[in-house]
């Protein structure tokens, strides 16, 4: 059998798997305040970060770059507390905002969240609580006890109400860990030191106690062993039994002698204590008895942090390895474990009762039976009540208690049992029935109500039936709770709560007999019946048949209610409801035509009998509605021709509902009836529906009546949108026939849809007086030739000129071509060309004329164009062609003219004269074309000359390709002719490079020999000689010595170097020797030929320094030092001075070194040489020579020498040297020592060193040389870190004016910084306040505003203070300052701008009082600005109390759009006082939120009738009909009185008004009132009044209508009665009694 475990273990995840470094898993870096978050401080590289692990999503840790010494997460939300030093901050991570911050006076060594909004802070001396609420600061709770001195604080706990506080610490003493705790009572403000390691508080309710007790549990490990203590802290609550202290041993295994408790948590649900030790052991204890339930090791590593695990009421923790573990009670096993393994049945029972756990059923049954048998009924009842899962709360148990008779003077055992059950919780169904039966028998219904409210009873249908006999409303509550729909609805009906029936039935899904219910409701209240009927049909699927509901209304003659119901019921317009729709419309057309008209107008219904309704509409005078319903064309045509009786807009829309044929028939009928009257309307219809009716049919319709005007207007409305060519053609024809030539022009110009050929033919046939439309069409569609022919043949040459001059000059070439085709006179054509001033293509004109071989025709015009300065290539091209064809000096023209297109003219000349083609191509650099012409015509000489002159490498590469068959002929001409003729070196150079690029060395030698050796101009050309020799070295080495000997003007050094690299050493030596480059020659002898003897002989023979130097260097390399030095001296060569100086320095021979360096300086002037020479002179004490030397030109490092002299104390020499090298900083320091201040300042400026400036500045200040000090200071203040020291130096000595002058002068500096502007502003506030505002206005953005704010406030500079507050966005303070000091700080624009930005709205209201006091005339401007932020009700009240409402009338108007009651009433009051009745009427119509009746009562007494009319209007709007009618009667507004009486639906009021008209003799009003109040007047009363006043004739129309209605009603009632009699044979009527069980 598997082992039974009372606890369950779970590993949630491992921190290392989430990327957490094991080094960061520890007490100092990881915190866990609850089971929601784990927070770890990490350091990745140099970057500190905080990692937050959400336990609900641990695989997605949140990492934030936060540097903090400690971080703890809020136990409930994503709020983190951070500590850095003494600074504490709380941030909301989700909102990304800082919530609170505080700086402690002492270091916080431990802190912890003790609730969701409180952090406990522990310092070395005290404990504080810091609440997140409001702006509260940490509050000190208690001072730390001396027993915790030197302890490491590891925990802090509080009870649930934070009345008991506990601080836990540990320390190492005598080779063991000692725990120290301090328990503090908040109420008693006393502490108690306790030895302990881990502790927790618990709220535990013992059996028999009314309230839970606060228990304090703590564990300790001392030298004698471990103990767990459980005690109650504080006084027990009233009526509670005190908790008996428990102290039990805590077992530590022998192998864990150094183990001790580290954590404790309470499992509140199960009443257990979880105790964790350092070695990872879990101890589980019963909280009430202290019994140890189990002990087990759950972790091999220390669990250093724990928290309650709320989902399981267990404990969760983290160990050193990074495992996140939780432990909880195993509910399925723990009772069995306690009973069977621990052999502790009492513990099992307590656990089962406490947590309602299974496993102890037999124990409970046995105990219950034992107690019951002993007569301990109360105890047995408690056992039954507390038994888990309700195992004893059965009918048998109730019967057992019922069987026991009650003792005299005592409650029966059954009632005792029920009482205990009620104390424990809710009764079940059986218990509830039995108890209620007993209570109701005793007449104690109030107990039943109390238990129901407390939810102590399980409601059922049986319970409701039981209660209903006593209280139906109480039974309704029971039925609702028991979910018995039939009984609930029955109770609703019996109690008159009809509207709740539908809602409840829908909610619970129950379906009663709705018609039966409705008929009963209707008899009780028609209005409630209407509402009930609406609820029955408000869903998509009605709950009852609508026809049956309508029958119920008609049975009771409720026409108005029936109409209202049907409008709601039929709103979905279903086809199946057609008959109902017909009934509704017929009913209202007979009784209320205006209602029917409204219904039809809204087009709510579409499925009624339209033919029947159409007839009724016609009879009711609704002609428009009748026309909409007619379907027969004869009826429609008969009605539609009466257009003067119909709304034109409606009629146009009506045609949209007709078929195409019917629409055309109706239009035909309308035009036939009265074309003058109906033409415009027909055009509108045709325009709107032309797509449906067909444009062609409509055109034929208008043409059949010869109405071109109508056709023009119709087509004009659609032509801009139509793509039909016929439409555009017909429109053009109609426009022509109606004389609309301008419109013809427009459509011809803009339209792209007509057939141009047809339009052109029509316009030609139309013979219009203005040919412009024809011109436009021909121009647009390329009929220019036809146009010219037409115009020319019809003698309309004037329009040809108009066309080319005004319409489209660009068509001139085509026009000229056409004129040439009709053999027009050349003079006319020339004149026409000359007359055109617009832009046209010369190319096209030339092409047109050239096609016809009439090019010379253009000569005069072309020459005139050129004389006018025309530079167009086409013009010059044409002229060139004419000159070429006429042989009129064409070559001269081609060479001199700069504007023709060379490619065009060259191509023109190719077949005529290739030479001219070359001229043209050469002029335009048409390379490929020229080469092609030359090759085709064997013009190689011209081609060679062109290539040489062209100097284009790419072109050369093209012609020198191997694929060029003419390359050899071309090269011959280049060599023989082109290069011989040229005098341009660049041409030669490009040509040679081209041959080199083409890799033609033999041809290149041939070319170069021709140039260089044949005594040409370029024979002495250096580069060409170089190239010839180099080419020979590359291609033919046998010629090299010959060329070297014959030529004299080549680069010897380069040639010799190339010869060396090509192993031609003798040739190289010959070149060097020939050109006297003996040093190079001896180098060849030494390095390449390798003969030193020959080299020495050569040096003796030459006796040149360079030669000796070469020889000396070689000797030095052979260690011949003495000989080498002699050679250097003979060669006068200091080049190896480094080696010489090093050797001389080692021998310390300064005199010889001076001689060598002097020689070397004469030759080399090297810096090192001169530096060493200066130092050598200094060392040899030759000061005068030193001064002469440094004053003369030199390249020495004088600074180094000066430093060496300065270090050795030679200051005069150093001064000379520093002066020479301009080391002004060191020189200034030297001069300060010598007392030369002026020179020191000058040199400081040159040095530009802050340290030097400070030193000189302070020295000048001490000497009161303020001018020099300011000069120095300007270079110091630009360094922010130096400014404070400089200012202190000035101010300590009282030089304030000088300091201000210094800072003012410094503001213009390029490096001016914020500190300068800030400090100057502060100085102004102290010593020159009049200049401060100007300074701030200029430089506010560059000052430290908080610092200047403090200074301005201290100096009472209010205007400046406001300015700064505004710029710093502290608008509240700015407004307060302006209101506190208005004479100095208030400015209107500034105030209005700032007041809108304040955060405290209260300031807006204070501003209103401020303006009333100081600026009342500007109050409206302020109100308009503040309007979005003001409470308008408060504002109106404020000005009303101040008696200033008229002053703010503009404001009231501006905010009335908010429809605020106070604003409306205040403005209405003002308008009344001003007698502005129009404004008042507009106000009350637009804004209805005011006391209508109060205003009406005021206005009815007004002396102006207009205001009394408004009063009547208000009474009417508020259903005060009698007052409204009386006012109308008084002011003789009889029509209004009748309308108000009719709208009131008050028959008595209408009757009184009718009688009043008779009393006043208003016969016409009597008749009008009969019509207006028709449905409110009783016919018998009207008949009597008419007869008595002899007005029967006036009343006759009324009686006729009444008779008609009564006859209709009688007919309908007769039909209904017949139907009812038929139904009576089917079923007998049932009384209004509801059972709802499916039976009546």
From Swiss-Prot:
The keyword Repeat applies. The modification Phosphotyrosine is found at residues 184, 634, 899, 1206, 1477, 1487. The modification N-acetylalanine is found at residue 2. Residues 524-1640 are annotated as: Heavy chain arm. It is a peripheral membrane protein. Residues 68-107 are annotated as: WD40-like repeat 2. Residues 639-1640 are annotated as: Proximal segment. Clathrin is the major protein of the polyhedral coat of coated pits and vesicles. Two different adapter protein complexes link the clathrin lattice either to the plasma membrane or to the trans-Golgi network. GO terms for biological process: anatomical structure morphogenesis; intracellular protein transport; mitotic cell cycle; positive regulation of D-glucose import; receptor-mediated endocytosis; retrograde transport, endosome to Golgi. Residues 1551-1640 are annotated as: Trimerization. Keywords: Acetylation, Coated pit, Cytoplasmic vesicle, Membrane, Phosphoprotein, Repeat. Belongs to the clathrin heavy chain family. It is found in: Cytoplasmic vesicle membrane; Membrane, Coated pit. The modification Phosphothreonine is found at residue 394. Residues 258-301 are annotated as: WD40-like repeat 6. Residues 2-479 are annotated as: Globular terminal domain. This is Clathrin heavy chain 2. Clathrin triskelions, composed of 3 heavy chains and 3 light chains, are the basic subunits of the clathrin coat. In the presence of light chains, hub assembly is influenced by both the pH and the concentration of calcium. May interact with OCRL. Interacts with AFTPH/aftiphilin. Residues 24-67 are annotated as: WD40-like repeat 1. The C-terminal third of the heavy chains forms the hub of the triskelion. This region contains the trimerization domain and the light-chain binding domain involved in the assembly of the clathrin lattice. The N-terminal seven-bladed beta-propeller is formed by WD40-like repeats, and projects inward from the polyhedral outer clathrin coat. It constitutes a major protein-protein interaction node. Residues 480-523 are annotated as: Flexible linker. The gene is CLTCL1. Residues 302-330 are annotated as: WD40-like repeat 7. Residues 108-149 are annotated as: WD40-like repeat 3. One of its GO terms (molecular function) is structural molecule activity.
